[in-house]
Amino acid sequence: DSKQVITFAILLAFLVLVSLLPKEEKHAISWKRIVPISALCAGYAALFFGTGLVEALEIAPSMWTTRENGLVLNFSVCLKYMRVEKPEGYTPEHLASLSREYPGEGAVLEDGQPVNVIVIMNESLADLTVLPGVESSRDAMPFLHSLTENTVKGYAYTSVFGGTTANSEYEFLTGNTTAFLPAGTVPYQMYVSAGDPTLVGQMKALGYRCIASHPYRSSGWNRPAVYSNFGFDETYFERDFQNRVYMRGDARSGYVSDQSNYENLVRMYEEKSPGERLFLFNVTMQNHSAYNMPWDNLDREVWLAGALEGRFQTVDQYFSLVYQSDKAFEYLVTYFSQV
């Protein structure tokens, strides 16, 4: 990474300059200064790490709070949460008893092992009409709702709301819950190491080539390092996607559309070797907040109806985005049903 090289070069130059500064004569250590300073540091450490001060002040470790609280405070908070305590009652024996209590039945595939496995985590996609009192002018998900043949579908509850997409990724790819982690922490930034058991590792053991793709900047949530630690063979981000089409803005302010995203998934599939097993994990970006953005390249085709009609323009934009996602997914399913 060129930025890392430049940063390292600047740091190295700074250290060289420091080494060339005139040296002052060393003086004897003044214990009168060291003792109170050490006591102050020890008291701060005890207060910060040994009490509930951080929680009481509602300071959470994340990339966003670094901008608000500064590097030193946020680093200290992350340091406090680097060690995660075991949940109460967590023992191998208890886990074994639970596995016996809830035995699983592995699925049997009539046609053997699938050649291609494609997983799509669609940003913020939800069916708002399941909520009481919410009606839309038309079905925003006609294709998804029409799927019955060769389909298993239902509703999923996420562990996050209004942000922290990376936690949903972490739970899916590792099978670990974030329920027992300190509030506000993001595993992608703090708790991922090379060699951790993941779905990616299982797929590679079965002979799959594993690809992660996300049509947004690679700087989000430490994804390049995480995907590498998870064992993905290849990773693709916004700049790697060809013929990008944006919604609600341009390349600077908008998001890559689901249709454009899926066309790139099709390209990745078509470029693989015949018979090669492919596991493709994709996180979309089209429906990311906020929902008061310009309607560039987005038609207003679905909106709130009933008692709420005309009251929430943000929901109208969200409904129209979901409608476009549904059409893009129909394109993807139609393509793979014919190959």
Regions found by a protein language model. Name each.
Residues 1-115, 135-155, 187-193, 197, ...:
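N-terminal secretory/membrane-targeting segments
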Residues 100-112, 119-122, 127-339:
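Solvent-exposed soluble domains appended to multi-pass membrane proteins
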